Amino acid sequence: MEKVGRRVFLGMGAAATAYVTHHLWNQNAESSYAQQSSGGVINVYSARHYDTDKALYNTFTQQTGIRVNIIEAEADALIERIRSEGSRTPADVLITVDAGRLWRAQEAGILQPIQSRVLNSVVPANLREPQGHWFGLSRRVRVLIYNKSRVNPSQLSTYEDLANPKWRRQILTRSSSNIYNQSLTGSLLAIHGAQKTEQWARGLVQNFARPPEGNDTAQIRACAEGVGSVAIANHYYLARLIASDKEQDRAVAAKVGLFFPNQRDRGAHVNISGAGVVAGAPNRQGAIRFLEYLVSPKAQEMFAMANFEYPVRAGVPVHPIVKQFGNFRGQNVNAAVFGRNNAEALRIMDRAGWR
């Protein structure tokens, strides 16, 4: 049976919500979305728990007349709910984080393929399911966080190098039940095959500074405290600490640096937050319009500014904190591979002793 990690969400607070609301209310009136108003309602099942997302949805209603009802829960609970509701489900759209979960939803038969010229032109091919079952809405990069007093960034290079004995008892990461680590392993499986990926996983486990525990923020804190020297985490977890109004969070962030792996070859591992139209959606056309709206320039900017994510749409600015991380090269592996390789990735992680 697959092990499924529990996603820990951090709210962005009133200031970010106000920022999003202000900017979205001032979107260009010439938007094609604003020129259409057919009314109706769409029901969105979402595993993203951010107040700023609600501001996005409210603005969609203002522009189109389509009301958005939100059901929030953990991704796997939402997938199971849609499955149990069957043909009677009121769900039109499923939004979740990680391509691995979107693949699970697709495999469960609860998403339908759609054709959208807007989505196909905006969302890069490697960040959407080839048949149109789901599309990336934002990008999340799996980076290396290093303790500045213990590691020179010149010592860092690739994900593969984390299995090098030179990092013995220095690596911090989440458990194998975490979907982000499962997808990272799944991408390595696609690149290197099972044998080399298992060798990597075994070497990585031998280098753990402690048994895996906590979320990505916990890994960064432990890295800053010297429990280990290098942590594997999604980039926005560090951005949140930098932006925190708590002095202790900013102090943690000041002790660590961020490194994009594999910049001399294929690029860093890029995952997504994404969405798909539910099979049998009562308002299919409204659901498609909603997804197209979420990749519009201003909506993409708000994703970036509110939660420190990278947009999927080219030319959209990132948050100033994220901009300070510098430019990076992202791998071109199709995100659908993460889910397709999930079961084998879990078996490899288990055999390697990654708990």
Curated annotation (Swiss-Prot):
Pfam families reported in the protein's UniProt record: SBP_bac_6
Keyword ATP-binding assigned: no
Keywords from the UniProt entry: Ion transport, Iron, Iron transport, Membrane, Metal-binding, Signal, Thylakoid, Transport
Cellular component, GO, one term: plasma membrane-derived thylakoid membrane
Record's keyword annotation contains Transport: yes
Processing after translation: Predicted to be exported by the Tat system. The position of the signal peptide cleavage has not been experimentally proven.
Job description of the protein: Plays an important role in protecting the acceptor side of photosystem II (PSII) against oxidative damage, especially under iron-limiting growth conditions.
Family from the record: Belongs to the bacterial solute-binding protein 1 family.
Name of this chain's protein: Iron deficiency-induced protein A
Gene coding for it: idiA
